[in-house]
Every structure is written in structure tokens, then in C-alpha cells.
């Protein structure tokens, strides 16, 4: 009996020990769901702080943040929270002795209370954001486990941008955008207020900027929009609305940086005041995307209006910066403008690039006199950088490197890692987006400080910014979708706690954060669960390879076009593609599909999987899967050119297909693209040749521009039946973009996807 009792005690001790280990592991996991992850977090074993009952917040040195915290806690916990001079949840001001530790704060939790020590008002706000995430995480248990956090930001500039010109978003929607930034400790909001497609800020001294420039003709993308006036689409912010948004941002410790574009992207302004152009107009507010040739003419009337605009802008925005654009300003009109050419001579300038530099420097001098500094896109480097300018490096990291080495500050927002208008998953299962791809892991991998900089130069890198251009984003739910979850990766990069080896941990925290987004009814992409498909060729056969970043899920697929279910085949190895088929695949967790279905159509012809030789290489940005792209049985998506297309700039496609052995055929088919706003044009002619020896070719069919223009992008060439081993296809590009079109005189782009032989 005594022995039995002893065994029972031993078992109970083991159960209690295992329970403690489970509890402690759960606590540790829960606290590591913070985004961005703090610089230093230590879990204590000293109990927890209760969240039940009435709570008291002691304001201490940070009354504003204490009030904010009390209000947020009442909403979260549905309980009374009292604000007093002191209390178990309390604030204290401390000195930050390390300059590199921006917005330093400490957060300590134990059974006696919650202690926040912060170096600045913004640091106290960020401590509150961390605490609120902890409260949300532990709300169900009724207490927050004891812990200690010592945290700070690596970068002083942690920015996000929203383009409200291409598509307009209300002041309340902008406030929501600010809410999202503040949760993840972002502190700069770049408000893109003017562009070719709309002028969005009220300027009382020049009312036509909004009366005319804020509205454009309705196009298909906005035909159902409520944001219309007199049959036109658009809108603008009154100065009172702007003041309200700025005050709202200030409470969230976010600085709003307004952008007034110059000298390019000015067609909305020129529609209102055509006399500010080189030609005199008339102009319409832009209804298409791309780069417009008509820009501000650098004459006194132009500078007078822009100075009036700046006078009103500086009274609305307390920001240290005004962004003046400076990007994508074609010199087409300036080259043929008598006034511009006279100004080049008068000012002793070398060319139109130096004229742009003159334009920017003149406006910088005026803005500096108002106590502000300018930011410009990296094109402001052309012709010489303005003395006090900060460079926003978007075309790559080179602009930031150049600026930092010259002693100028730079903000890193390269198109490769920071453009949120790009697809974040497979274009076939994602909403329409710009023609490129930017997945969550690539955002997370970005290091804002280029390795080319030494320690002193690196101090000029203020931080990263992600840009939300809205050509294809017509409503705010779509903005949310493109923002989340990539904003989470951006926040960790900007805070300085992203690490390549920690991506898996970050990914798990993102998935955990989806529950919060669901509760708040925030729209977000689930591309993190999506499958990736890759076409491979082995020993003359084609296969479709599937992969997923969530290795604990099961991939199931079908080849008959039906949707996959839990009864569908389990993917174990690449699927053989030996006939025309549709493969549908998806991730499954237990009996539930997670993410979207990956669909891939294959259309097999006699050329599928064969060897191809090109006379001219495609542009390095649009090489897709090389020559295999032309014979993989997959048609390209005309909204996404990075995959399944070959792109040529100023070159023909001349492709010779080795059919391996002589075969009979009488048709060749290919797809091409005509998107003139993107400088992409249909070819001028297509010719098909055949050969037995790859030396002597015979022309069997050709079509010209008239037929191609009627083809709707699919060119079919039929001819008498041939029996040959080699097929050569020549696709002749448009030599120069015609006058009157964007990019006039430049080489046209040519895009071709599949060369099908039947």
C-alpha cells in the first residue's frame, strides 16, 4: 500500500512537471508572436499580471499615451480602466544614452504591474503598441505572463506610401491606412497627392487645380465608382480634411510627407492651366497609365504657381520634408521648346538633364526658405543633385549608394523589394496587379543598407519605404489586400529585427496575426499558403513540379480540370505533361483546403518540349524560363510579363525550332501583346520558314501589319502541309514608337509567348 502511494506521488509530480513545461512553452510561444519582434525579450518565471477586473493606468510623464492606452484597453477588455497619476500600469521617462537606439523603451511585466519606461513620446507610443499586442494574445487566459522587453528602432525612417491620384481614397480610408501603419510601429506616411490622373489637394489660390484637375473621364476600371462628379471620376481633400488627417497621424506618431510632383507627372495640373506647358495644350486629365511627354515648362508662370502651391502646402503639413517627385520627366517637349532651349543657353546649362536639375534646385531653394527640405525620386540625381536634397532610391539601390557617398541622406524603396502594387502570389489566383511579383519572403529579405557603403556612409541611409501605386487598385479593400501581410515584413525590416535565419519564425507569426486581421475584417492575401508550379524538361519529356513553403501541408491535384478535394491524388513527384490538360492543385491541412487552387493549362503541339535557338537574346528583365518558354505548352498572361513571355526591346524574335525529326505540319500559332501605354506594340510582320538541314530555309508563309492588327493578339499562319525537321519563326518588332505616343522615338517592346506548330 505504501509502495503504491509512492508510485502515485511520483506520477503526479511528473504530470505537474509536464504541465508546467507545457504552460511555460505556451507562454514563450505566445510572447513571440509580436510583430515587429522586439530587439530583446526575456520571459520570466515570476507569475503574471491579471487583466480581469477594473484596471488603473498611471499617466506619469506620458499623459497622452496613458489616455490612449486606457481607451484601447477598455475597448479590448470591455472593462473599466481608470486614469490616475499613478497605478499598477505606469509610465516613466528615461534618458536614451545610445544615439543608434532610436525611440528606446523598456516594458516590464510582473504580478505587481506593468512598467513602461520610454525615452520619447513616440517611444512610449511604441511600448503601448507592444503591450496591446500582448494583451490581445493573452486575453483568453486573463493575464499576461511576466516578461521584460528592451526595444528600439534601427531606422529613423520607417515609411509607407499611398498613391491617391491614380485612384482616389477618402480621408477616412487614409486614416485606416494610418491605423495599420501605427500598429506595426511605422512612422512615416508618404501621401502621393498629385499626378497625371488627378490633383487631390485643395489649393485656394488656384482653384482650377481641383475644379478641373481632380476629375477625369470615367473608364472601365471606375465605371461603378461612387466617386463621381458630373459624370467624371475623382475627388480631392479640402484643406480642413487634410488638417484633420495630419492631426490624426500626429496622435499615432506618424509624420505625413506630402508629394507635389514636378516637373513631370503634371497632366492633371496642365489640364487646369495649359499655359504652364511647352505647347499650350489643350489637355485632359490622364485616363491611361504610363509616362506622359507633356510636363511643366520651366517658365516664370510655372514657378509662380508652384511657389503658391508650396506656400499653402507648408501651412498644412508640419513635416520637415516636402516630396517634389522629380521622376519620369521626359525631355521630349523641352528639346523642341524655344523657351527651354533659350533657358539652357541663358543659364549656361549643358542639356535638358541639367535643365531639370535647375528646375529642382530652384524649387528646393524656395522650399528651404520655408524651413523645409526636399525629397525626390532618384532621377533628381540627373544633371546634378540639389544641395540639401534627400534621395528616394526606387529604380534600384544605386541611387541611394550614390547619394550616401556624396554625403546626402537616402530612403531606400527599390522596385525589386518595396513595390506593393506587384503580385504577391501566382497571377492566375491573385487580383489584377502591376506586371511583376513581390512575395512576402522577398520583402522580408531586404536590407536597406547596401554593402557597398562604409559605416560613415551608411549613416545617411534613413530607412526603408514601401510604395502602394494604385493604377490597378480601385478600392480600399484592394489596398488592404496588397498591404497585408507584406506590411508585416516591412515593419520588421524597418524596425531592424529581420534576420534571414528567422524567416520561418516570422512566417509563423504572420499566420498567427491572420486571426487579428480576421477579427478586424481586414482583407489580406493568403498567398503564403499557395503552391508554386515549375515546368521542367527531362530527357525530352515535360513535367510540372509543385512546391509549397508550408511543408507540413499535403498537396493534392487533378489532371482533368476538376477542383482538387481530400480524395484527389497526393502529389509525390513531378506530374508528366504528355497531352493537353489542366492541372489543378492545392494545399490541404487535414481535411481542409488552405489557400487557393493553382490552375495551369497545358496546350500541347508538335513543337512542345523541343529545342529552340534564338538569334537575339531577350531583354534580361523578361527572359522567363529562357527558350523553353516558347515551347512549354503554356500561354502567357497578358497582365504579367515576368513569366511565360519573352520580351525584346528594339530586337526581333528569330527562333529556330529543332523538331528532333522530320514531322508534318501546316499551322504555326503565336501570341503577342499590344499595350502602348507600356511601350509594347504588335509586330510589323511574322514569317515562317522550314528547313531539313538548319542551313537552307524556305519561306512558307508571312503576314503583315494589317492582319496582325486584326488578330487580337493571337497570330495564326496556315500554309500547305510541310514535312521538315526545322521551323524558323521571324517576328519583326516595330522599329520606333510613333510620334504622339508615350516614348515616341524609342525602340518598341515586343512580347511573344508560345510558338505552337500543328
Report each predicted region and the residues it spans.
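Bacterial Sec-dependent N-terminal signal peptides
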Residues: 1-33
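Short, compositionally stereotyped local motifs that mark structural "simplifiers"
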Residues: 497, 501-656, 673, 682
